[in-house]
Amino acid sequence: MTALVLAGFLGAAIIIVAFFANQQGWLASADWRFPAANLLGSVLMMGSLLVQWNAPSVAIEGFWMAISAYGLVRSLRA
């Protein structure tokens, strides 16, 4: 398993933990850390897709990154 694939698993774990924390009420979606975690996770997952290409996954991760970046900017401006 390459470092990029491991990074992809780490990215998935970050996204899952952020989502779980949000569902538990521990991390509000308006908190800058929520979109930051989603952005970091999706960047790491995108890196793993360089090794194991999957066009639909690249598409969803691209949108996930863009929406997370937008949410992070909004959170930091508030």
What residue ranges belong to the model's regions?
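Small-residue-rich packing faces within the transmembrane alpha-helices of Major Facilitator Superfamily
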Residues: I16, S42, M65-S68
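Structural signature of hydrophobic alpha-helical transmembrane segments
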Residues: M1-A13, S57-M65
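C-terminal structural segments of small proteins and small subunits
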Residues: W53-A78
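Cytoplasmic-side transmembrane-helix entry/capping segments in multi-pass membrane proteins
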Residues: A30-N38
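Membrane-interface helix caps and helix-loop-helix hairpins in membrane proteins
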Residues: M1-T2, Q24-A28, L50-A55
